[in-house]
C-alpha cells in the first residue's frame, strides 16, 4: 500500500516513487468519484469516467458492449437509483494501467414513489483503467458478475 499524501510530505522520495504515489492517488480519486456518481441521481455522469473505447463484459453475455450499449443497458437508472454499500477489495497501479476489484451490495430503489418495491442488487466488478494521452485516468473495461451466493 502506498503511503497517504500527508505522510509522503515528511519523507524524501525518489521521483519514480513519487509518481507512483501520484498515480495511485489519481486512480483512487477516480474510483471514489465513480462510486459516488453510481449512488447519485445523476447516473449519466458515470459514463464520463470511461474512455471512449470502453468495453463492458456483462454477466451471462457472450458479446461485449461499448459505451452506447452500456448507456442503453443502464437506462433503468432514469427510474431507479442504486442504494448500495461498496467495498474496494483491491487497487493496483502499474505504469499506464490500473485495476480495481470492487463489490456492490444493496438495492435498486425507485426514484419516484410508485409503489414499486426495492430490487436486490449485488455485483462484483473488475475495472481496468488506463492513462489517457492527456495524463488523466479513465475506466477502460468493466468486467462484472452477479453472484448467486450472496455470502
Predicted segment positions?
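Short beta-strand edge/turn micro-motifs at domain boundaries
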Residues: 2-15, 120-151
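Short, low-complexity N-terminal intrinsically disordered segments enriched in polar/charged residues
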Residues: 1-52, 93, 150-151
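A solvent-exposed, acidic/Ser-Thr-rich amphipathic alpha-helical stretch
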Residues: 43-94, 103, 107, 119
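Beta-strand secondary-structure signal
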Residues: 99-105, 124-128
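Short strand-connecting beta-turns/loops that link adjacent beta-strands
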Residues: 93-96, 133-135
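Short, conserved clusters of charged catalytic residues that mark active-site
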Residues: 29-30, 83-86, 124
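Short, cysteine-centered beta-strand-loop-beta hairpins and adjacent loop/turn segments enriched
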Residues: 107-119, 148-149
Amino acid at each position: 500500500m502506498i503511503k497517504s499524501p500527508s505522510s509522503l510530505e515528511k519523507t524524501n522520495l525518489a521521483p519514480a516513487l513519487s509518481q507512483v504515489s501520484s498515480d495511485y492517488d489519481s486512480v483512487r480519486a477516480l474510483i471514489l468519484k465513480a462510486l459516488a456518481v453510481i449512488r447519485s441521481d445523476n447516473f449519466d455522469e458515470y459514463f464520463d469516467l470511461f474512455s471512449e473505447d470502453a468495453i463492458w463484459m456483462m454477466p451471462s453475455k457472450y458479446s461485449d458492449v461499448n459505451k452506447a450499449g452500456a448507456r442503453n443497458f443502464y437506462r433503468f437508472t432514469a427510474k431507479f437509483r442504486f442504494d448500495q454499500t461498496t467495498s474496494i477489495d483491491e487497487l493496483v497501479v502499474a505504469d499506464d494501467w490500473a485495476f480495481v476489484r470492487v463489490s456492490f451490495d444493496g438495492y435498486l430503489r425507485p426514484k419516484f414513489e410508485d409503489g414499486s418495491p426495492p430490487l436486490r442488487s449485488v455485483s462484483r466488478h473488475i475495472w481496468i483503467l488506463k492513462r489517457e494521452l492527456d495524463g488523466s485516468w479513465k475506466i477502460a473495461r468493466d468486467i462484472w458478475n452477479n453472484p448467486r451466493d450472496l455470502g
